[in-house]
Amino acid sequence: MRPRLALSLLLLSVCAISPAASQSILPPTASGDMIFDAWASDFQGRALAAGIAPEVLAREMAGLTPDPRVAGADSRQPEFSKPISDYLKGVVTPDRLAIGQRRRADVAAFPDIETRFGVPRDVLLGVWALESGFGSIQGDYDTLRSLATLAAQGRRRDWAEGEIIATLKIIQSGEQPRSRLRGSWAGAMGQTQFIPS
């Protein structure tokens, strides 16, 4: 075989198995937002390289659009936009303290959590109280959409993409469907508002 032909065949075979080449088999997003669509197209190769199956990626990215409610929300977080004393006055209230004291005594799962995970109940109670008001405010944002919006904005791209990949792995494993992955605008979910990773 001629060296030039052999080199051409080798290059074609390498391109056929590379993440960048795999990316082109996925349908592009068409949100109407050029920045978001460019990010989504670029991200697909990284998701495939991280082990996300092409069919999962194509299904979950199909029809994905930026969430206008998320845009700019990270600059308005009360814990970062208020003086700490004002923030604490709003979250450490007599009602919340009373609920915490009742929950501390009532929740039967605390001994198991403390033993299995090494998390003291008072730490868990504090997180539970501050993050979701003991589960009363968990958010209803589509976690994948929120994280994709943050990634496309660029300021927190690396962090958000890591969380998107973690979200896609949860979906891919069958642990939870995307419809159950709901939470805050920042991608935090559940009663303790933990992020996907």
Regions picked out by a protein language model, each given a short descriptive name:
Residues 25-31, 93-97:
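A ubiquitous short alpha-helical element
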Residues 19-22:
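Boundary at the C-terminal end of the N-terminal hydrophobic targeting segment
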Residues 8-16:
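Bacterial N-terminal signal peptides
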Residues 32-59, 66:
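Mature N-terminal segment immediately following signal peptide/propeptide cleavage
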Residues 1-7:
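Bacterial N-terminal signal peptides that target proteins for export
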Residues 52-197:
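Catalytic glycan-binding domains that act on GlcNAc-containing polysaccharides
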